[in-house]
Amino acid sequence: FTLIEIMVVVVILGLLAALVVPRIGPQVAEAQRTMARSQIKSFEEALEMYRMHNGFYPSTQQGLDALVKAPTISPVPKHYVEGGYLKKVPDDPWGNPYIYRNRNGRIQIVSTGPDGEEGGEGEGADVTNDD
């Protein structure tokens, strides 16, 4: 191949990449949001099982880790399932820990989204169980 032929191929590949990459970005972001919603749904199901066995949800202080290992701080569950309710608590799709709150029996689970901070709008918006 001549240098000109190779340069033409590189330019064509560059143009194709310029057309394809912008279309993939939004799909990746939506896939991450869908994954976060799915993980939050799994947490809700495990939390409901925890509540059915013990009569209450884990406290905010106990957090989602109470689904993996029996809490030792109050309120201590009396009927904790051997092996726990989840094998582990994964981070959200952006690598951030989920935020769990128990406000008088009302559960809130938050993924802080791609910006890693609570709040935000648009692509930086949080994903919650309230969505």
Question: How does the language model describe each region?
Answer:
Residues 21, 26, 62, 69:
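Phosphate-coordinating loops and pocket residues in cytosolic domains that bind phosphorylated ligands
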Residues 26, 30-34, 41, 45-48, ...:
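Short, surface-exposed interaction loops/tails
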Residues 42-44, 48-51, 61, 72, ...:
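Non-catalytic regulatory appendages
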